[in-house]
């Protein structure tokens, strides 16, 4: 029995069928639709807000800002992170669905910035709390640099393998130690706590025999001509 051939059918299928893997298809769909959660605490966030305007138009990159971490796959930290804010940041990151990404924007987020030298409450780098995918230095970085960081993150997503990423997050994640502070009384109210101040005993409270005994024990110095 002769087989029927469809030359037109074979020619169209050869030009339209694409062979790929499920991992590459997943990466391609995610890199074009990043939904960021904006975690801005200082002036760096103002630079990111300028991307919303028509000059840069970050909608063309598929960015859709979300207000809930459960709907976001990218968190962008911009500004100083303090010890008091650290638990909230970690909680937001843990509420994001997998796979999730982090962009650390600005010197204050990456290293603590100018507050890292003499501040007791500043986190010296947000990577001590959550894993960071892209570091964006600057004080503050320009909007063009933010677009470049997003482009680099898209390239990273297109090359990654999801099981390897989960394993890397489990091995390379680190946390800061818990800082314990002791709350004292304020000295700006005028009511000073006597326990924090040292007051030497007055001479009226010292017995006379003790005072003269100490005075006689001190040797006198003679002047030699």
From Swiss-Prot:
The molecular function terms in GO held by this entry are: 4 iron, 4 sulfur cluster binding; iron ion binding; NADH dehydrogenase (ubiquinone) activity; quinone binding
Topology in the lipid bilayer: Peripheral membrane protein
In terms of InterPro entries, this protein maps to: NADH_UbQ_OxRdtase-like_20kDa (IPR006137), NADH_UQ_OxRdtase_20Kd_su (IPR006138)
Q: Name one GO biological process term.
A: photosynthesis, light reaction
Q: What is its EC number?
A: 7.1.1.-
Q: How is the cofactor bound?
A: Binds 1 [4Fe-4S] cluster.
Q: Is Cell membrane set as a keyword in this record?
A: no
**Whom does it interact with, and what assembly results?**
NDH is composed of at least 16 different subunits, 5 of which are encoded in the nucleus.
**HAMAP family reported in the protein's UniProt record:** NDH1_NuoB
For this chain, the family text in UniProt reads: Belongs to the complex I 20 kDa subunit family.
Q: What is this protein called?
A: NAD(P)H-quinone oxidoreductase subunit K, chloroplastic
Classification lineage: Eukaryota, Viridiplantae, Streptophyta, Embryophyta, Tracheophyta
């Amino acid at each position: 029995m002769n087989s029927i051939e469809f030359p037109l059918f074979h020619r169209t299928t050869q030009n339209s069928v694409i062979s790929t893997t499920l991992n590459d298809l997943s990466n391609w769909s995610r890199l074009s639709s990043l939904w960021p959660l904006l975690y801005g605490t200082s002036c760096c966030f103002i630079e990111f807000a300028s991307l919303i305007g028509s000059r840069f138009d970050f909608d063309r990159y598929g960015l859709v800002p979300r207000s809930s971490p459960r709907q976001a796959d990218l968190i962008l930290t911009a500004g100083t992170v303090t010890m008091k804010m650290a638990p909230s940041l970690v909680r937001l990151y843990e509420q994001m669905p997998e796979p999730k990404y982090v962009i650390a924007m600005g010197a204050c987020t990456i290293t603590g910035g100018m507050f890292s030298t003499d501040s007791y409450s500043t986190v010296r780098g947000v990577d001590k709390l959550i894993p960071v995918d892209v570091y964006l230095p600057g004080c503050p970085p320009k909007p063009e640099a933010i677009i470049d960081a997003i482009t680099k993150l898209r390239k990273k997503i297109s090359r990654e393998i999801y099981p390897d990423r989960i394993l890397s997050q489990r091995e390379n994640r680190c946390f800061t130690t818990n800082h314990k502070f002791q709350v004292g009384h304020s000295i700006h109210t005028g009511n000073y706590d006597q326990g924090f101040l040292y007051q030497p005993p007055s001479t009226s409270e010292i017995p006379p025999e003790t005072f003269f005994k100490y005075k006689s024990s001190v040797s006198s110095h003679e002047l030699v001509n």
